[in-house]
Amino acid sequence: MDLRRLAGWPLLGLLMVGPGLALAAGKCERLIATGSPDAPPYLWQDPQDPKHLIGAGADLLTQVAAQLGIKIELLYAGKRAQALDEVRSGRMDLLTDAPLTTTGLEALDYVHPPLLENDYLVWTRKDSTLVINRPEDLHGHTGALSEKSRMTAGFGVFAEQQLSLTRTPNLTQAFQKLLLGEVEYVLAGRYSGLAMAQTLGMANDLQAAPQPVDKPGLFLAVSHNSACNDPWLRGQLAQKMTELSASGLAEAVLQRNLERWNTQLQSPVGAPKQ
């Protein structure tokens, strides 16, 4: 038996209670979660405690776990690919910021609705005359996109077929190309773009169109190999995600963590390569 599971009640007690209570009695008392370590304000490595992750995703998941009576720890597991491997193997239970993909479904149980939305906006220089009201307006213009971006499958097909996009290793280089005039726009998340603009000192030089061109969700995803993966946990998480989506709390938490990230920039902490 996994050491994180509660010992449970005596067999006689389990037979006397309803099925819901019997199921809850065997729940995990502790979950280990991870995610991208370089994606502020969603998640990033805690500069004061590098073994842990902080950010909007961590705050929301910690709150949800407390409501369920479960202890949760957000641990740094390495870069994105390493974090995914840790969860797929079951060594860690939960991925906090999983994009919905067909390959992901082979190893993960996604909890709906998503923990956070990640609106992708069109970023341009402040002096740009480019007018974008819909994705089709980008046709014929040169743009850039970080290879680490995780768009929806539908928009990915559209971008591949219809847009002239340069893929860069990270968002830093995409924004630098924009300021140098090598591209006309960059596709980047609303909050990740703001965080990177602050990091690079470009906040006064860039602007973002208000209308998202893509809205990929960032999901909680439980490993198929986690000893804690059971119907009770998935059901409770789904209920809490539904309540969270209706509450409007996520945007306030994102704003707070954007300010938190900006405050950390005042200290000599390395900028993330998104």
Describe the residue ranges of each PLM region.
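Periplasmic-binding protein-like
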Residues: 36-38, 117-121, 200-238, 260-271
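Ligand-binding cleft/hinge of the Venus flytrap
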Residues: 44-47, 61-69, 113, 137-139, ...
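A ligand-binding cleft/hinge motif common to bilobed small-molecule-binding domains
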Residues: 81, 98-106, 156-157, 184-215
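Ligand-binding clefts/hinges and TM-proximal coupling segments of bilobed small-molecule sensing domains
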Residues: 71, 150-163, 204-205, 239-274
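Extended ligand-binding regions for polar small-molecule ligands
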Residues: 55-67, 141, 149, 221-260
